[in-house]
Amino acid sequence: MIEHRPPAWAACLLLLAACGQSESPAKNSVTVKLPPAGVPVAPESSYSSIDPASCKVVGDSIRRCEGAAGYALEMDGEVAIVAPDGRRSILDLSKLGTKGAPKLGAKAEWRGPAPGHPHVLIVRVGSDLAIARLEYPACIVAVVAQQSHQNEKAREIADGKLPACLSR
């Protein structure tokens, strides 16, 4: 019996023919479309409720509100950001003139290059907007007093180079 084998160059042709073909992604993979290099990515916001009715009570008195991308806010007289890995950072709201438990708005805005990748939290405290960086240890980096275009001003700060923490 004579064995017929294709020439070695045939394998090269098959490889070249496959070039330019797209592979189908694995079933458990995530495909992210990125803009071309050098094109800036517009920041995006996602929102979560911090209304007491939508949060759960953990322990004796801590109210835990789920946020974006695995983050959470915990409140019991103070406000803490809980990172996806479980690390807690207590936000110092004393610079906002709050006495006792701070009066928070009904929602938190999580801002970053994509909804699933926030790097900043914007939350209403009284009539002010507090901007907190999420990088551990999280901290408040700016406060925007009540004014016209307050939300836009807070987003402008959040989308730029973040200032240093206001206090530790």
Language-model features and meaning:
Residues 1-17:
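Sec-dependent bacterial lipoprotein signal peptides
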Residues 3, 19-93:
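Charge-rich, low-complexity N-terminal segments
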Residues 12-15, 33, 103:
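Acidic/proline-rich low-complexity IDRs
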Residues 47, 55, 73, 108-110, ...:
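Generic structural hydrophobic/aromatic packing signal, biased to beta-strands
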Residues 80-125:
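Mature extracytoplasmic domains of secretory-pathway proteins
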Residues 112-168:
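A short, solvent-exposed beta-edge/loop patch
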